[in-house]
From Swiss-Prot:
<feature type="binding site">
    <location>
        <position position="145"/>
    </location>
    <ligand>
        <name>S-adenosyl-L-methionine</name>
    </ligand>
</feature>
<keyword id="KW-0963">Cytoplasm</keyword>
<comment type="similarity">
    <text>Belongs to the methyltransferase superfamily. PrmA family.</text>
</comment>
<keyword id="KW-0489">Methyltransferase</keyword>
<dbReference type="GO" id="GO:0005829">
    <property type="term" value="C:cytosol"/>
</dbReference>
<protein>
    <recommendedName>
        <fullName>Ribosomal protein L11 methyltransferase</fullName>
        <ecNumber>2.1.1.-</ecNumber>
    </recommendedName>
</protein>
<dbReference type="GO" id="GO:0016279">
    <property type="term" value="F:protein-lysine N-methyltransferase activity"/>
</dbReference>
<dbReference type="InterPro" id="IPR004498">
    <property type="entry name" value="Ribosomal_PrmA_MeTrfase"/>
</dbReference>
<feature type="binding site">
    <location>
        <position position="166"/>
    </location>
    <ligand>
        <name>S-adenosyl-L-methionine</name>
    </ligand>
</feature>
<comment type="function">
    <text>Methylates ribosomal protein L11.</text>
</comment>
<feature type="binding site">
    <location>
        <position position="188"/>
    </location>
    <ligand>
        <name>S-adenosyl-L-methionine</name>
    </ligand>
</feature>
<feature type="binding site">
    <location>
        <position position="230"/>
    </location>
    <ligand>
        <name>S-adenosyl-L-methionine</name>
    </ligand>
</feature>
<keyword id="KW-0949">S-adenosyl-L-methionine</keyword>
<keyword id="KW-0808">Transferase</keyword>
<dbReference type="Pfam" id="PF06325">
    <property type="entry name" value="PrmA"/>
</dbReference>
<dbReference type="InterPro" id="IPR050078">
    <property type="entry name" value="Ribosomal_L11_MeTrfase_PrmA"/>
</dbReference>
<dbReference type="GO" id="GO:0032259">
    <property type="term" value="P:methylation"/>
</dbReference>
Length: 293
């Protein structure tokens, strides 16, 4: 069944009101997108931010007369008669198949591959992780996850224990175990992340070596030879003492989730405990690494 969609340029002040009006006009779904590729980082608790320039897309059944919808919208004072819009036909597709076709195996470093379950493994002799896109946690496609995976691929994990601080999907924890770590502890504030990490560890046959905790449940004096934290600049600054105390002397640290302009400032929070390396960059993102003093 074909569809028709109405695209409207709006702003963060009127996006919600416009969404409600379009639903009243019979829209089947509303999508809000950034109109100018403006990133949003670290919203405050309970905040659902929108972009200053927002593109709203309303999907309708193909037989809906959108000229009537547009005429009704022109009566709204915040839009007026000359508001910008576009009407497009939407071809009916097998959306699930189209979505799956967008994901392919990705190589990180010299040994490590992340492979969707429906794809053939490119190199059976490599270190392969089976991971499907799902919850809004890392799958390797984001530059910060890629930076962490490349760093993990470069390490020697013989007799090493690892902490994945902010484990999300568990991709970094599973990678460390597949690369040879003896044990990984994953910590996350989100119980859905704990469930996702557990499921991905089971899928990859490393669940017996992975222990998962919410922060309030983690053991006292938990320490590891290697700690990786792919979270955000704010928590990395705030939690620097806690993160530092979890790394054994001589242990290795990697921090990501940072924009390039945040990297050096965040690194300063760790220099009293770590000998920090120069940041590594991918696109606008950075990774910090260091050795515990």
């Amino acid at each position: 069944m074909p569809w028709i969609q109405l695209k409207i340029d709006t702003d963060n002040q009127h996006a919600d009101t416009l969404s409600d009006l379009l639903m009243e006009e019979g829209s089947l779904s509303i999508t809000l997108e950034d109109g100018k590729d403006t990133p949003i980082f670290e919203p405050t608790l309970g905040e659902t931010p929108l972009w200053n320039h927002t593109v709203l897309t309303a999907l309708f059944e193909a037989d809906r007369d959108l000229s009537i919808v547009v005429d009704n919208l022109k009566l709204q004072p915040f839009l007026g008669a000359d508001f910008s819009y576009k009407i497009e036909q939407v071809e009916d597709k097998d959306w699930e198949r189209e979505w799956m076709d967008n994901f392919h195996p990705i190589k990180f470093g010299e040994r490590l591959w992340i492979c969707p379950s429906w794809r053939e493994i490119p190199d059976p002799e490599a270190v392969n992780i089976i991971l499907d896109p799902g919850l809004a946690f890392g799958t390797g496609t984001h530059p910060t996850t890629a930076l962490c995976l490349e760093w993990l691929d470069s390490l020697n994990f013989d007799n090493k224990e690892v902490i994945d601080f902010g484990c999300g999907s568990g991709i970094l924890a599973v990678a460390a175990l597949k690369l040879g770590a003896t044990k990984v502890t994953g910590i996350d504030i989100d119980y859905q992340a704990i469930d996702a990490s557990k499921a991905n560890a089971e899928r990859n046959g490393v669940e017996d070596q992975l222990t998962l905790y919410l922060p309030e449940d983690q053991p006292e004096n938990l320490k590891a030879d290697i700690l990786v934290a792919n979270i955000l600049a704010g928590p990395l600054r705030e939690l620097a003492p806690l993160i530092a105390e979890k790394v054994k002397p001589g242990g290795q640290l990697a921090l990501s989730g940072l924009l390039q302009e945040q990297a050096l400032e965040v690194a300063e929070f760790y220099t009293q405990w770590f000998d920090m390396d120069e940041p590594a960059h991918k696109e606008e993102w950075s990774r910090l690494t260091g050795i515990r003093k």
